[in-house]
């Protein structure tokens, strides 16, 4: 009975892990940085409402994960006839929050991610050297499935790459809400290498997935 129980438990665990892999968000198309979009019309200016804008994140290990948020520091868009023609926003990397832990465990992980722990500054985001990240729009387009695709240069930890992600945009003349579908980026493309099995070959099962899942919500009001 014990053997059978162990066998079925193992099968169940593999099944759950398989479902988890299948549910993983799609990786953003990533390429070299591109020319930033410039509005060619007299569009309307919108300013990002930082109190209602955020980036949600998830990080994964083989048997667990953590999640939290990062705040938007400032940003603006230029909109013409309901279309965002150009824009950017700045991400406050000092605002990294872990939402699935409490007390010392929460504080310890937040400090490690931000790089405020002596000797571990460069493990993740090193906010003392790189206190902000930026996203600058380069293009809006339509995918083969009809979804709106947003492309932009993500400058993170001093490394700039262009990413393309599916988004939903709602505009009513006074307010614009831009919300991405969940997507992942390969953190090593921005030199966030700590615990990466693709960078270090001696980690065994003690590694952190390269993929970080993100979901962006930007709320902007007419300036």
Q: Could you tell me what each predicted segment is?
A:
Residues 1-19:
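Sec-dependent bacterial lipoprotein signal peptides
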Residues 21-223:
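Low-complexity, acidic/polar, glycine-enriched regions of mature
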């Amino acid at each position: 009975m014990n053997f059978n129980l162990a066998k079925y438990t193992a099968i169940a665990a593999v099944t759950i892990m398989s479902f988890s892999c299948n549910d993983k968000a799609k990786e953003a198309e990533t390429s070299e940085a591109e020319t930033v979009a410039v509005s060619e019309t007299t569009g309307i200016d919108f300013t990002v409402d930082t109190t209602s804008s955020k980036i949600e994140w998830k990080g994964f290990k083989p048997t667990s994960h953590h999640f939290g948020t990062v705040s938007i520091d400032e940003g603006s868009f230029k909109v013409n006839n309901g279309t965002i023609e150009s824009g950017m926003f700045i991400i406050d990397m000092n605002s990294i929050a872990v939402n699935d832990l409490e007390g010392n465990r929460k504080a310890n992980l937040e400090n490690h991610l931000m790089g405020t722990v002596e000797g571990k500054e460069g493990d993740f985001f090193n906010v003392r050297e790189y206190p902000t990240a930026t996203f600058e729009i380069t293009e809006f387009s339509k995918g083969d499935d009809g979804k709106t695709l947003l492309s932009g240069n993500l400058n993170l930890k001093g490394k700039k790459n262009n990413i393309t992600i599916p988004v939903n945009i709602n505009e009513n003349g006074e307010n614009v809400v831009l919300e991405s579908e969940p997507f992942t980026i390969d953190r090593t493309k921005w030199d966030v290498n700590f615990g990466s099995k693709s960078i270090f070959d001696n980690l065994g099962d003690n590694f952190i997935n390269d993929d970080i899942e993100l979901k962006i919500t930007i709320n902007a009001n007419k300036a």
